[in-house]
Curated annotation (Swiss-Prot):
This is Sulfate adenylyltransferase subunit 2. Gene3D superfamilies: HUPs. The gene is cysD. Belongs to the PAPS reductase family. CysD subfamily. Residues 280-302 are annotated as: Disordered. The keyword Lyase does not apply. Heterodimer composed of CysD, the smaller subunit, and CysN. Pathway: Sulfur metabolism; hydrogen sulfide biosynthesis; sulfite from sulfate: step 1/3.
Amino acid sequence: MDQQRLTHLKQLEAESIHIIREVAAEFDNPVMMYSIGKDSSVMLHLARKAFYPGKIPFPLLHVDTDWKFREMIEFRDRTAEKYGFELLVHKNPEGLAMGCSPFVHGSSKHTDIMKTQGLKQALNKYGFDAAFGGARRDEEKSRAKERVYSFRDKNHTWDPKNQRPELWKTYNGQVNKGESIRVFPLSNWTELDIWQYIYLENIEIVPLYLADKRPVVERDGMLIMVDDDRMKLEPGEVIEEKSVRFRTLGCYPLTGAIESEANTLTGIIEEMLVATSSERQGRAIDHDQSGSMELKKRQGYF
């Protein structure tokens, strides 16, 4: 990587650290969403840098659907223990009681109950007035038009027509009681930036991002990994061992892998240099209907 590229990453790093510090200084009760993925790992690393040698002055929150990959949960708990940050884990109790499952209820309803409603429950429970998220503008078209400080009303809903101008990187965090701001310090990063930064900073990631032989079935054009015995096979489906990795991580029945031999960070970066599709192509929830992500965000999803 040439010096110009390194400078570019340092500029992104400085911008993100500035945003994280601004939120910590401006809001009464911020929280950092921790989804365990690569973007969350970078955001956590930046937060640790922002307040080093002190501890991160706000908790991390994971909204657990009970359907995450087992390796993700193991990584989450190991990371929390290693760095000693406060980790809050919330599961929607109503969703658990009804046995909410992507197999039984479908991707759209499962995501709404276990993710969107679960998130809103947690934000209300703890009274957070700002919540960091790891979304980037290059991921998806609705995220491309979102502000760094994204205003949410008392119902946690997002109205893209009711947002504040952000001139010269000046952010408006004024909110009334019950309102909140979703904050996206990685807004201007690309997927390639994320991987190059992970490589340069030696950031730990969930092993699922690296290619390995894994049991998968092909369903709806996606390779779904069989992560536990809850995976229900449809007629004609056969479990195969393939060398795959994940560009994005979510609930395992709703997350597609890609065939790959990239089992190192440099291998992933080489793949990203020639990639022509978004990582969100591997998320079943983004294909529920046209404009699916924007609809979910309007309802309170990140």
